[in-house]
Each structure stands twice: as structure tokens, then as C-alpha cells.
Curated annotation (Swiss-Prot):
One of its GO terms (biological process) is arginine biosynthetic process via ornithine. Belongs to the lyase 1 family. Argininosuccinate lyase subfamily. Keywords: Amino-acid biosynthesis, Arginine biosynthesis, Cytoplasm, Lyase. It comes from Shouchella clausii (strain KSM-K16) (Alkalihalobacillus clausii). This is Argininosuccinate lyase 2. Gene3D superfamilies: Fumarase/aspartase (C-terminal domain), Fumarase/aspartase (Central domain), Fumarase/aspartase (N-terminal domain). One of its GO terms (molecular function) is argininosuccinate lyase activity. NCBIfam families: argH. Pathway: Amino-acid biosynthesis; L-arginine biosynthesis; L-arginine from L-ornithine and carbamoyl phosphate: step 3/3. Transmembrane segments: none annotated. PROSITE patterns: FUMARATE_LYASES. It catalyses: 2-(N(omega)-L-arginino)succinate = fumarate + L-arginine.
Amino acid sequence: MSKLWGGRFTKTAEQWVDEFGASIGFDQQLVEEDITGSIAHVTMLAKQHILSEEEAAQIKNGLKTLQKKAAAGELVFSAAQEDIHLNLEKLLIDEIGPVGGKLHTGRSRNDQVATDMHLYLRTQTEEIMEAIRTLQAALVKQAEGHVETLIPGYTHLQRAQPVSFAHHLLAYFWMLERDYGRLQDSLKRVNISPLGAGALAGTTFPIDRAYTAELLHFEGIYENSLDAVSDRDFIVEFLAASATLMMHLSRLCEELILWSAQEFQFIEIDDAFATGSSIMPQKKNPDMAELIRGKTGRVYGSLFSLLTTLKGLPLAYNKDMQEDKEGMFDTVKTVKGSLRIFAGMIETITVNTDAMAKAVTSDFSNATELADYLATKGMPFREAHEVVGKLVLTAIEKGVYLLDLPIEVYKEASSLFADDIYEVLQPKTVVGRRNSAGGTGFEQVKLALGKANDLLSQSIKG
């Protein structure tokens, strides 16, 4: 089969060479964007009298026919035509005749593919942002029922201080809010049109780049034709934001996995998001959480792969840049799938409040409260820290917890202790008193829930 660019060649490549160089196996995912960009381009060509209205109408009708066939899954692509652009151009010529060959006037595949990816990423980024909001809503809904449910807070995976379970869940809400913001900000770079930049130097045809940008709902155009076709930083930025998002999901997955283990029993993951064992009948494995944790590495890999591909490329377009798409497609699929699974998983977890309550009363996570108690009575905090450390050691030696020590032991340690110390040491008192801004105190958690709900409401209205 002859190539659309084959005029200067005297021989054709072997089929296996064509297959190695072809990208149609994956860039056919850009079929809708490619047709949309082409319709805008040919509309502009007619407006600028580069093509006649009749020619433009023929081409647009042909493109819309291909669009319908694509939606119905009726288009057949060929590796011999390399990519989605040449495949569609060949199919268009087959559909409407030689006039289809005028579509590419004033355009290169270099600005064409860049336009496709800008259109694709704009849509996908907006859909991922919506999915983040859905997960955030699930976290808020779960948190609203557990403002006064207490869970051990950890540092170094050692119990540190008790916190509200709602406060813990909302930590991820705010991480996701920053992820949302990063993606939202990236749209400023995505929503710029490279169409009309040509191969690298622009074109001699009197095209109107601003008009095609307007037709495609871009906010502006690339100001430099070399830049427009040479860089993929907008994809790098998307991949970096996605990698950060997946890192946050992976961390919460790790906690869900730990919390669902027999050693914790803080939560139970719904059967719909777990699997069993082929040999051990008792097993219930948190597979979906583990898969999201594992798939995080795929997204990291896509980011590092593209950065490595781009780092040594001279301007302008190089065939290496064909490698920019598969990682992008895979990341979009991975992130969207992970967010969808996660929202369902969070909505349906069963919280074992009894296990959590038992955990916060069978440790020394209220020790900081003792030190704060002494500090509020005038003892320097560093001295208070040492006094409480010795009380913890005494309790460990006696095989009890701080609430179990008799008042005499406290008064022997410091005359500042009084009978009210036992109320101070109660887990709900410990948590409830931490009402500094952003703290785990119940009033602060309720305020945080209000702010979170306001953000979600604004997104719905927007």
C-alpha cells in the first residue's frame, strides 16, 4: 500500500518495519479529537478562502461520516498508514474522493497530533477532577458519622496521640484538594492551541490560528511554532500531578490494608472490594486497595519514562515523541479506575468503633496530655516531659496504663497533680481539648467538615 508521504521514496519498507514504526495500535484512541481538530481546521480554511465553501463542506461532511462510523466501531485502521492522522486522511479520501487530500493544507502531523493531545488531556483532566470530587464526597460522608469516634494517631507506626477518625479521613480530603488544584492549574497549559504551527516553522498560507483556537474552545495559542510542536511539558505536568494523586491514594490504601488486618480490626472492607484465597477458605484479602497501591508504580513509571524520552531531544519534532502517548493513556485509565474503586470502597467500609475505642484506652497515647497539664500549671514543658516519661516507665513496670496509676504515684512525681488528672487522661478529653486551628478537637473537626462541604457545594454549582 502506497504511503501518503511516499513521493520521494524508491522502495517500500517491509511489513514488520511498518508495524514497528506504527502508532495506530494505541493512538486510535485520539480518533474523536483528530476529527474534531480537522473539522475546525477545514472550517478555518474556508473562512480564509484557502479552500472553497463547497470543498470545505464536502470535507466536513466526510469527516462527520467518519465520526459516526468511529462511534459505531466501524472504522478499520491499518498499520501501513502508521497513525491515526494518516489513517483518517486515507479513509476520508476513500469516502469523498481526491478533495479529501486538501484537508491537510496548511497543517502538519506535528501540530495535528499536539492539538489532539491537548484536546484529549483537557477532557480527561476535567473528568479526573470530577472523580476526585466524588471520592472527597465519600470521605466527608464517612467522616460525618465519626466525629467523636477515636482512633490511635501514629508516628513511626507507633501510637502517638488519639485523634478523631473523622479528622484522620479529612486529612486525605485536603490532600485530594491539592491534587484537584494541581490538575485545575495544569489546564492553563493544556488549554492552549498548537494548531497552525505546522511542522515547526508555521505556514505560508494565510491561516487564522486564533479562529481555530476559538472553535476548539482553547483560551489562546502557542506564541512560538517551534515550542508548539516540540514540547510535551503539558503531559509531563499531568503525569506529575497524577503521580502525586496516586501517591496519596496509595498511602490511604496502605492504612486500609493495615486497619483491616486481624492485628488492628479497625475496619472491614466490603466484600465487593475484596477477594478470597484459592486454598485458604477463611481469607478475605483487600485486593482492590492492594491493586491501587501497586498501580501507583505504573503512573510513576509513565512520568519517568516521558521525562527520560524528552531530556535529550533537539528541537523540533522527533520520532521519539511517539512514545509520549501510551504512558498518558495508561495513566488516564489507571487514575480514573483507581478513583472510581476508591470512592466505592470508602463509602462501604464498616468501622469497628469498639476496636478503635479499645485501642485508644490500652496505650500511652494520652501521655502528652499529662505533660501539657503540668505545663499549664507553670512547669517548664521540658521538665514536664521528663516527669511524664518517668510515670510512663512506672506504669510499664507495673503492667498498667496511666489511667490505672493511683493518685499517690502522681503526687509523688509532682505536687502539681490533683484528682482532676483522671478526667484529663480520658481519651475523649484528650482529643476534645485539641481545638487549635486545624486540630483534632471535635469543634475543629466540625468546622473542617463545614469547609469541606462548602467546597463540594461550590464545585456542584460551578
